[in-house]
């Protein structure tokens, strides 16, 4: 089920842990020739400064062959590329996969 929130965010529930979901997405990206540029462990970084945060990780990924033509058409799109997917656990222990809606990005950057 896709849940669109205000601001163009799409939330999809995951039946797996944050780490399992990250690994599944990494495998999908790799199988499709998409580069994973970074994996940000927000909860791990919070722990380093003595703060507690539920498991929260951000994947930053993309494909120059797909993204470059879009940025040539709408240079402001570089603000939102490479793409990002947030995987987090909520206060109830439910894991969510969140990303910016493609329709939101199209509208935001004036793409046809």
Language-model features, listed with the residues they occupy:
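Compact, glycine-rich, soluble single-domain proteins
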Residues: 30-83, 87
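A short, structured loop/turn motif at beta-sheet edges
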Residues: 88-95
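Short, solvent-exposed aromatic-acidic interface loops
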Residues: 100-105
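Short, compositionally biased low-complexity segments
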Residues: 1-2, 96-98
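Terminal, regulation- and interaction-focused segments at domain boundaries
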Residues: 2-34
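Small-molecule pocket liners
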Residues: 8, 57, 95
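Well-ordered alpha/beta subsegment
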Residues: 107-112
